[in-house]
Amino acid sequence: MEISMPPPQIYVEKTLAIIKPDIVDKEEEIQDIILRSGFTIVQRRKLRLSPEQCSNFYVEKYGKMFFPNLTAYMSSGPLVAMILARHKAISYWLELLGPNNSLVAKETHPDSLRAIYGTDDLRNALHGSNDFAAAEREIRFMFPEVIVEPIPIGQAAKDYLNLHIMPTLLEGLTELCKQKPADPLIWLADWLLKNNPNKPKLCHHPIVEEPY
């Protein structure tokens, strides 16, 4: 008897990764590990936070003994923030990082990133969002211009396609049959670009160069 299996579903998550100030010089090396681990680097920026900004970012740790040292450390130099995406991005990035305390990581998870690049409990080299809510908040903090939306999965993805993609695509294919262009693929691509219902309106602003 043949068993009909449902089609596989692809789940894509986003998480925030930070290369902390004391290992910024290892950025290229760490990005190579990230890419080889199946992540896509959706966005990346290098910036320096003020102590006040660091306090706002780590607001849930306010009042703890290490809080002043943490904000001083994180504002001591430029850091690199990245939005990472892949299947189970949040949990897999945390797994790559290893324990928060780099001294513990060196003993229990010697191949983890914090064991390799970190120094101790405070200077643990890298940051990763703990859960979906944290990832959403932290991405908005570091990338305020980014629209953080859940990526459609499973039935939600099918519903999205049927509602937002298929009507425009069918209209384009119908017009394609009427026009009968010499190069159908190029014609359809151009038509879809011109008739995209979600096409944004461009607003030109001066670009401010970051100091780092």
Curated annotation (Swiss-Prot):
- Alphabetically ordered keywords of this record: Cell projection, Ciliopathy, Cilium, Cytoplasm, Cytoskeleton, Developmental protein, Differentiation, Flagellum, Hydrolase, Primary ciliary dyskinesia, Spermatogenesis
Write out the tissue specificity statement of the associated record: Specifically expressed in testis germinal cells.
Per the record, the GO terms for biological process are: cilium assembly; cilium movement; CTP biosynthetic process; epithelial cilium movement involved in extracellular fluid movement; establishment of localization in cell; GTP biosynthetic process; negative regulation of oxidative stress-induced intrinsic apoptotic signaling pathway; nucleoside metabolic process
Q: Which InterPro entries match?
A: Dpy-30_motif, NDK-like_dom, NDK-like_dom_sf, NDK_H5, Nucleoside_diP_kinase
Query: GO cellular component annotations, sorted alphabetically?
Result: 9+2 motile cilium; cilium; extracellular region; radial spoke; sperm flagellum
Please state where this protein is localized: Cell projection, Cilium; Cytoplasm, Cytoskeleton, Flagellum axoneme
Q: Where is this region: NDK?
A: 13-145
Enzyme class, UniProt record, top EC level: hydrolase
Q: What is its EC number?
A: 3.1.-.-
Please give the clinical condition linked to this protein.
Answer: Ciliary dyskinesia, primary, 48, without situs inversus: A form of primary ciliary dyskinesia, a disorder characterized by abnormalities of motile cilia. Respiratory infections leading to chronic inflammation and bronchiectasis are recurrent, due to defects in the respiratory cilia. CILD48 is an autosomal recessive form. No situs abnormalities have been observed.
Assembly notes? Component of the axonemal radial spoke complex 1 (RS1), at least composed of spoke head proteins RSPH1, RSPH3, RSPH9 and the cilia-specific component RSPH4A or sperm-specific component RSPH6A, spoke stalk proteins RSPH14, DNAJB13, DYDC1, ROPN1L and NME5, and the anchor protein IQUB. Interacts with IQUB.
Function of the molecule: Functions as part of axonemal radial spoke complexes that play an important part in the motility of sperm and cilia. Does not seem to have nucleoside diphosphate kinase (NDPK) activity. Confers protection from cell death by BAX and alters the cellular levels of several antioxidant enzymes including GPX5. May play a role in spermiogenesis by increasing the ability of late-stage spermatids to eliminate reactive oxygen species. Exhibits a 3'-5' exonuclease activity with a preference for single-stranded DNA, suggesting roles in DNA proofreading and repair.
Q: What name does the UniProt record give this protein?
A: Nucleoside diphosphate kinase homolog 5
